[in-house]
């Protein structure tokens, strides 16, 4: 036993002084960051607004249009309903903002709906929230990028047939930027976000000035493709209004993002995140009302060929000139950048769920740039697949959207309401430490419980309306998918739990010493690689048996002669193979030895293995080690060891 004289322990810490080498990876994504650099990778309120709010802010580019597309079923006369619906959506936004502002201060470690549900509602609601949010983040990328592509097509119709290719390329670009790290991606996305906000407020402000002065006219050559496709008009019913409202609530997706990413903010984290949330809600509500009101006034029509933003911009500025192109460019960029909110939160949430054992644990490991690289790559792959399947159509993707996020809204706020109820039962000075936060008495617990409870009811109603009104349009896919995902989460968790049980040391009884160590050395010939493997085998045991499967009698005779010269006295067993099989006779021989093995005996199969200079050359050699490893992977007390021999 080696005991350190200074510490008196067998456990020693050693500084490897390792510095990562420069490579293509470092050129693309930057130098690797040490764990100690993590505090420097946090962001302030200005960058935080760009990173975590681009999804919510950009939704004004498609949410008003989706409302009009539903109302178009009753004709253009029904478009006036969109304005009161926009006010109703803003009212719901206020409720959500108040609720999530409380969540941010109650859970400074972040986690959002997943952590809140886990701590207050239980394991099953937490997994439902995780499934809902992860689904929503994937759809956020697909919808945002597809909407951005729609803006490009509005300005440049020649690119219509390249929508899918452009969309996938945009996803890959965002993935590359995010793999460089939170701080760098934050700076990269800040400029486009503020560029969009400035251009939109100029457009809305100028439009309102022209409206007030009576100089804002009607949109010229409004696209009628979608309206003309309505051969039979429907009456304005409560169902139609609710369906339009449900489509408009997609503007609220992304509100929860800041509460999920609190740990990315500089200290004081909760304060900075809370202020960012309030600022985001104020900007979002203002743009939603402004765009809906002006679009309704100028007679803009919903269309697959030209977006509402495009019609509003060219009408406000009276042309498709430079200001129009600036607005279209800014909107396109922010819609693509909106996907970044999902790239910021999906990896964090999947890491949380993975660390709890409900997703592969690899998702919880940070990459060289202190980001959850595997989560970023997984999100990119799935979102790209959706863009391909749905041909980058926002209208086809929207019905899948929002159910997941409103389900997570409902669970998060219900969990917070339950948390405040628990807080109200605490006595002065009493504390309860939970996994995600610490419960302390709060004199305002009743008011906070009412706010969260009312918010939970509101979002549950919206979710139900969305599920019913959008069911046949595609919402049924998400309704079926969520239970399937939750089942998969539990299957993964069951695997990890069973593995932990088998690896547990609690009931472990140390096995006796190995009484006999038998080494089997399969050889196909006698050469330097064989002798290197034999030399290693002799360090393990004196009980070594070389084995050759005889397929060619003349070749076997040559091997036998060489072995007598180079085998160093080690016995060689020749296995006859009349059917010219290699693996099966060898496995049969090992099985025979295994049957005679005593309780504390162990068998090691030492396999010589060529390592060619060129990777492609592996295809020219038999993969005996791999085949044996697969054959014995479930066999107890049989060890497969490869001895590589580098061929220079």
Label the predicted regions:
Residues 1-38, 498-507, 511-648:
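Cytosolic C-terminal regulatory domains/tails of membrane transporters and channels
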Residues 2-64, 70, 98, 109, ...:
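Membrane-interface "cap" regions at the ends of multi-pass membrane proteins
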Residues 68-109, 113-118, 122-127, 143-170, ...:
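Extracellular loop-to-transmembrane helix junctions
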Residues 123, 163-168, 264-286, 354-388, ...:
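Loop-to-transmembrane helix boundary motifs in multi-pass membrane proteins
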Residues 174, 179-213, 276-280, 398-410, ...:
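Membrane-interface loop-to-helix entry segments
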Residues 194, 201-253, 469, 473, ...:
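Helix-loop-helix junctions that connect adjacent transmembrane segments
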Residues 207-218, 275-311:
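Extracellular/periplasmic helix-exit of transmembrane alpha-helices
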Residues 223, 362-373, 411-471, 502, ...:
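C-terminal membrane-solvent junction of multi-pass transporters and transport-like membrane proteins
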């Amino acid at each position: 036993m080696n005991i350190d004289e200074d510490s008196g322990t067998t456990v020693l810490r050693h500084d490897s002084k390792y510095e990562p080498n420069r490579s293509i990876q470092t050129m693309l994504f930057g130098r690797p960051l040490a764990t100690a650099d993590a505090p420097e990778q946090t962001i302030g309120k200005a960058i935080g607004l760009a990173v975590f709010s681009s999804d919510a802010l950009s939704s004004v580019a498609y949410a008003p249009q989706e409302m009009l597309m539903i109302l178009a079923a009753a004709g253009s006369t029904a478009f006036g309903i969109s304005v009161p619906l926009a006010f109703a959506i803003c009212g719901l936004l206020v409720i959500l903002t108040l609720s999530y502002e409380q969540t941010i201060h109650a859970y400074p470690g972040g986690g959002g709906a997943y952590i809140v549900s886990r701590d207050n509602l239980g394991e099953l609601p937490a997994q439902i929230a995780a499934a809902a949010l992860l689904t929503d983040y994937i759809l956020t990328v697909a919808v945002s990028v597809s909407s951005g592509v729609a803006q490009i097509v509005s300005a440049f119709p020649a690119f219509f047939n390249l929508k899918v290719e452009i969309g996938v390329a945009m996803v890959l670009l965002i993935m590359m930027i995010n793999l460089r790290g939170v701080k760098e991606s934050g700076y990269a996305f800040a400029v486009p976000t503020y560029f969009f906000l400035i251009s939109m407020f100029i457009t809305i402000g100028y439009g309102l000035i022209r409206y007030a002065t009576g100089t804002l006219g009607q949109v010229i050559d409004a696209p009628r493709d979608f309206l003309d496709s309505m051969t039979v008009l429907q009456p304005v019913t409560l169902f139609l209004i609710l369906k339009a409202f449900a489509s408009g609530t997609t503007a609220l997706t992304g509100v929860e993002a800041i509460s999920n990413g609190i740990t990315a903010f500089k200290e004081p984290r909760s304060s900075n995140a809370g202020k960012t949330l309030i600022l985001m809600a104020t900007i979002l509500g203002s743009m939603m009302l402004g765009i809906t009101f002006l679009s309704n006034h100028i007679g803009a029509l919903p269309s697959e060929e030209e977006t509402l933003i495009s019609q509003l911009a060219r009408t406000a500025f009276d042309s498709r000139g430079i200001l129009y192109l600036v607005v279209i460019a800014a909107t396109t960029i922010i819609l693509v950048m909106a996907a970044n909110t999902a790239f910021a939160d999906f990896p964090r949430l999947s890491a949380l769920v993975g660390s709890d054992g409900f997703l592969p644990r690899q998702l919880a490991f940070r990459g060289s740039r202190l980001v959850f690289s595997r989560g970023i790559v997984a999100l990119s792959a799935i979102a790209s697949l959706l863009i391909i399947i749905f041909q980058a159509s926002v209208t086809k993707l929207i019905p899948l959207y929002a159910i997941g996020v409103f389900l997570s809204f409902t669970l998060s706020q219900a969990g917070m309401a339950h948390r405040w109820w628990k807080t109200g039962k605490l006595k002065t000075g009493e504390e309860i430490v939970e996994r995600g936060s610490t419960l302390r008495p709060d004199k305002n617990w009743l008011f906070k419980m009412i706010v969260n409870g009312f918010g939970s009811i509101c979002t549950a109603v919206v979710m139900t309306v969305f599920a019913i009104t959008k069911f046949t349009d595609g919402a049924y896919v998400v309704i079926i998918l969520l239970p399937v995902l939750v089942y998969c989460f539990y299957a993964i968790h069951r695997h990890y739990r069973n593995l932990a049980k088998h690896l547990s040391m609690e009931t472990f009884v140390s096995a006796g010493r190995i009484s006999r160590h038998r080494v089997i050395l399969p050889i196909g010939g006698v050469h330097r690689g064989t002798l290197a493997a034999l030399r290693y085998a002799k360090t393990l045991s004196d009980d070594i048996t070389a084995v050759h499967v005889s397929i060619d009698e003349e070749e076997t005779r040559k091997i036998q002669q060489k072995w007598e010269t180079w085998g160093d006295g080690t016995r060689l067993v020749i296995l006859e193979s009349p059917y010219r099989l290699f693996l099966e006779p060898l496995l049969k021989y090992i099985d025979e030895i295994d049957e005679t093995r005593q309780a504390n005996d162990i068998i090691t199969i030492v396999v010589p293995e060529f390592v060619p200079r060129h990777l492609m050359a592996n295809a020219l050699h038999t993969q005996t080690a791999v085949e044996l490893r697969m054959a014995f992977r479930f066999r107890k007390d049989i060890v497969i060891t490869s001895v590589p021999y580098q061929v220079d």
